[in-house]
Amino acid sequence: MKEKSEEKRVAELFLHLTGIDNASLKEREMADAVEAILDELEIPYTEDDTWKKTGGNAGNIFAKLEGEGEPMLLCAHLDSVAPALGKKAVWKEDGTITSSGDTVLGADDLAGVAEILETLRRLKERNIPHRPIEVLFTYAEELYDVGSEFFDFSQIGSKEAYVLDASGCTGTFLYKAPTIVSFEVQIRGLASHAGFQPEKASMRSRLRRMRSEASRWDMWRKIRRSMSGRSPAVRGRISCRSAAR
């Protein structure tokens, strides 16, 4: 009966969270709901003010639950893709939870948020021995990780992290995935018309050569080494734009 009541509790928590507006850069109400639960569990946390740099209204929430041994990090994001305003979650008779049909449900990533909060609750209620748990709830993840981009990662002591933000079978996890690499290149050259004097300073031919070189796997490996993290870039997905000035 205890496990059954815990299952119902986490479902009710998920239902509660998915009924809260959480558009990117408008996560204030969601952040307040999460912080209220952390207060209830007496788990200390801080919320940064990086939203001032991004035009949002809520920051990244970082919490710690003390334990023994090496720390580990649990992470999820507070926002959902649009439309995520005016949400209303519906718990159907068959046990499924859906949106009302006019907005997204927001399971991405409120399922992860609910799982982390319920994990913290169970650890405390059952007095289960555990490692130190660091928790990071980021904002504006759906806008190419704007929130986490400004987070002060020096606060994190964990070398092991689980980001609860993927679909799949229970008990499975992803350990790598493609990523997006954007860079801007400025090329200074001589004024020249490609139709009359291509041999002098044709930018098109130079851009074509640059694109060809950049698409080679060896260069991608160099780019990957200069990046933080281990996500491999997608080979050949490079575009170049130029303008005559």
Question: What do these predicted regions represent?
Answer:
Residues 2-28:
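N-terminal capping segment at the start of a domain
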Residues 16, 117-124, 210-216:
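Short glycine/serine- and small hydrophobic-enriched flexible loop segments
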Residues 31, 37, 56-57, 64, ...:
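Active-site metal-coordination/substrate-binding segment of hydrolases
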Residues 98-107, 192-197, 234:
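A short glycine/serine-rich beta->alpha loop
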Residues 103-178, 220, 225-233, 237-238:
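Acidic/histidine-rich catalytic neighborhood of metal-dependent amide-processing enzymes
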Residues 116, 161-197, 201-211:
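Phosphate/diphosphate-binding glycine-rich loops and adjacent basic-rich segments that engage nucleotide
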Residues 197-231, 237-239:
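Acidic-enriched catalytic cores of C-N bond-cleaving enzymes acting on peptides and small amides
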